[in-house]
Swiss-Prot record:
Protein name: Immunoglobulin superfamily member 11
Provenance organism: Rattus norvegicus (Rat)
Membrane topology field: Single-pass type I membrane protein
Gene Ontology CC terms, in alphabetical order: cell-cell junction; excitatory synapse; glutamatergic synapse; postsynaptic density; postsynaptic density membrane
Topology feature Cytoplasmic, residues: 261-428
Amino acid sequence: MTRRRSALASWLLLSLLGVAASLEVSESPGSVQVARGQTAVLPCAFSTSAALLNLNVIWMVIPLSNANQPEQVILYQGGQMFDGALRFHGRVGFTGTMPATNVSIFINNTQLSDTGTYQCLVNNLPDRGGRNIGVTGLTVLVPPSAPNCQIQGSQDIGSDVILLCSSEEGIPRPTYLWEKLDNTLKLPPTATQDQVQGTVTIRNISALSSGLYQCVASNAIGTSTCLLDLQVISPQPRSVGVIAGAVGTGAVLIVICLALTSGAFFYWRSKNKEEEEEEIPNEIREDDLPPKCSSAKAFHTEISSSENNTLTSSNTYNSRYWNNNPKPHKNTESFNHFSDLRQSFSGNAVIPSIYANGNHLVLGPHKTLVVTANRGSSPQVMPRNNGSVSRKPWSQHTHSYTVSQMTLERIGAVPVMVPAQSRAGSLV
């Protein structure tokens, strides 16, 4: 810090003394450009009439990044050289042997931060007068870094897309040139290019817009490129595929629904058919009234019970169930059984009798009960032409029995009227 202050004091002193001396610093070329990493030479020379015994040279820099903070680069005073700012250590030196009237310096391995305005201040006592400051600009050039290529926007056919290209580094600022890598190396007719911003706008893209595009970033000392593949998407095939898939799915669903409906219908039909086949057609038949007994004959009361007699009305069949068949002849046989009791009741005694005529009870002059019983086999079942079942009557045997009142009273019988019944047991 003390050395820096002494250098600044010497620079001010030399400046004041230079007003009266004849020392003159020659004009510099104004600006020096160098690529990053290379060596830059900053020229500075002066003329004097005095010996170089008291020569003082100071190099200062005003950085481009921070103009308010000047920095010392190198100092020559009293026959010795002193380093300036830390970032210049080992990289800066005088091009010639000091002391000399050529006080140019070099900077090795230049960096981007080395860009700025350099000042050369020369004093050589006792010379006075002239201009003792030289100014030289240094620009460290940086080639463009590898640019980044992007696509902005939809790539569907008919859309607008923007091709972007930019480099992070590059001094001077690079320019960008887009081209399509085909036979013509030209952009589509609908493309608009901005070389400063590095953009290309392609409107209403089509299948012809597809291809490989190249962006070239360049400046004074170098170039760099990037590639971008633009593939325009045609929506028609995708829409056709979606429609085809939807139609196929709908068709499958319809087929499944039809199959389920048909299966349910056939199942219902077969089930209903089985139920119809299981049903036997029934016909309601009317029974005719049983025939009335024309005569009542007394029978012996002690009749064997093994005859299996039943109280029933005569079974008849309606003539409408017969197809032009004559009405069968009923063969009824009456058996008259007389017992000793019959003789005991004969004479003048009047015995009340009860007659069974099928519908009602009639009191007669003899007190005896006449029971009419039918015994016969069931009618034969015969099929008819219309699918119904008819029955063919068999011959029946009718037996009449007479029971005396005394016998009925002895067994505790009560007179009742039995209505006529059909073959099935229902009342007529």
